[in-house]
Curated annotation (Swiss-Prot):
Residues 309-344 are annotated as: Disordered. PANTHER family: FCS-LIKE ZINC FINGER 10, FCS-LIKE ZINC FINGER 11. It is found in: Cytoplasm; Nucleus; Endoplasmic reticulum. Early expressed in hypocotyl and cotyledon and preferentially in the stelar region of the shoot and root. Later expressed in root-shoot junction, lateral root, old or senescing leaves and in pistil and pollen of flower buds or open flowers. One of its GO terms (biological process) is response to salt. Induction: Up-regulated in response to mild as well as prolonged energy depletion. Up-regulated by the glycolysis inhibitor 2DG. Induced by NaCl. Induced by abscissic acid (ABA). May act as an adapter to facilitate the interaction of SnRK1 complex with effector proteins, conferring tissue- and stimulus-type specific differences in the SnRK1 regulation pathway. Negatively regulates KIN10 leading to a repression of the SnRK1 signaling pathway. Interacts with KIN10 and KIN11 via its FLZ-type zinc finger domain. Interacts with KINB1, KINB2 and KINB3 via its N-terminal part. Forms homodimer and heterodimer with FLZ2 and FLZ12 in vitro. Keywords: Cytoplasm, Endoplasmic reticulum, Metal-binding, Nucleus, Zinc, Zinc-finger. It comes from Arabidopsis thaliana. This is FCS-Like Zinc finger 10. GO terms for molecular function: kinase binding; zinc ion binding. It holds the Pfam family zf-FLZ.
Length: 344
């Protein structure tokens, strides 16, 4: 009787000891049935969201026995994927870029990052130094607003530096008559040419960089070029007398067009109404044969006659030119007693 009771007790203990194992096996089968047909890539995509909204969709996936731990993990990841910055950036892009008020500076409230100021509100690393009002009024024109600052990139150009460099003369800004504007190409001045570069007028005329241009006509003008400097309307008589009274040989001369003499270059208004060869009237709808631009003919025969005449005239002119050249050569040989000299 005791053996039977011991057997029953042993069986009962075995039964109670194997019950948790069976429940674990059943739970394992349940979990495997839930994730049946899933590949490893699906789990990786579930743990790699592409936007902050994917956390809610994939929050139900995971170990059902570790729900609290998975929620804490998702909360930590969601904190690193904070969407507050994205929203503020979108709102800031809708703000007018021309609004430069200091109150419009947006600072992102993030404890893990530093304050960020957008580039549209930044102008320079250091504040520009404004000039004093009387100094700018003395150097700048009247139509310029006082306290103006020239700003290029991150550097501030002072008007005083421009004056020292010589790019803008203060007399020009003040409205004086004697002024000079310097640049890399040319200089236009109304000053005395005798004091240019410390040289005299004779040295300037002998130099290869000197050129004198004289314009004749109703408004005569003499222009002197010396290097990169241009001098107009020189009033000194000494330079005018030496330069403009044919004491020096000019390189070339361009005569102005005399518009007072009639020039027969335009055809008559009715040149299409008659034949240029036989003077026959040309009616409407008839064939017209043109030659030399403004000569109209009634037939091709009349036009060919005119072409032959022009060719004979051209040949005669060439023969006369050849005869004149040969006669001049003979006369030169006679004067030189049979000795022909060449230049070179």
């Amino acid at each position: 009787m005791s053996q039977h009771s011991n057997y029953q007790m042993t069986t009962a203990s075995d039964y109670y000891s194997t019950k948790p194992v069976l429940s674990a096996i059943r739970s394992h089968k349940l979990i495997s049935s839930v994730f049946e047909g899933k590949c490893p890539s699906d789990y990786e995509s579930a743990w790699s969201p592409t936007s902050p909204l994917d956390f809610r969709l994939f929050s139900t996936l995971g170990n059902p026995f570790a729900a609290s731990s998975s929620r804490s993990i998702w909360r930590g990841k969601q904190r690193s994927w904070d969407s507050g910055k994205v929203g503020l950036s979108i709102v800031h892009s809708l703000v007018d870029d021309h609004h430069t008020d200091s109150s419009a500076t947006i600072v992102l409230p993030s404890p893990d990052s530093k304050n960020i100021i957008f580039g549209s509100l930044m102008r320079s690393g250091q504040k520009p130094h404004l000039l004093s009002q009387p100094f700018t009024k003395a150097l700048m024109p009247k139509d310029v607003i006082p306290n103006a600052v020239f700003e290029i990139g991150h550097d501030v150009i002072d008007v005083l530096e421009l004056r020292k460099s010589g790019s803008v003369d203060a007399a020009y800004c003040s409205g004086a008559e004697n002024f000079s504007v310097n640049n890399n190409a040319c200089q236009v001045t109304k000053q005395d040419p005798g004091s240019l570069n410390g040289g005299t007028e004779s040295d300037m005329e002998i130099s290869e960089d000197y050129t004198c241009v004289i314009s004749h006509g109703p408004n005569p003008k003499t222009t002197h070029f010396y290097g990169d400097q241009v001098m107009e309307s020189v009033e000194r008589e000494e330079l005018k007398n030496r330069c403009c009274k044919n004491e020096k040989e000019s390189i070339f001369a361009v005569a102005p067009l005399d518009l007072t003499t009639p020039v027969d270059v335009l055809p008559p208004k009715d040149f299409l109404s008659f034949c240029y060869g036989c003077s026959k009237k040309l009616g409407m709808g008839e064939d017209i044969y043109m030659y030399s631009g403004y000569k109209a003919f009634c037939s091709s025969e009349c036009r060919s006659k005119e072409i032959d005449l022009d060719e004979e005239m051209e040949d005669g002119d060439e023969e006369e030119a050849i005869k004149s050249v040969s006669s001049s050569d003979k006369e030169s040989k006679k004067k030189s007693n049979g000795v022909f000299f060449t230049v070179g």
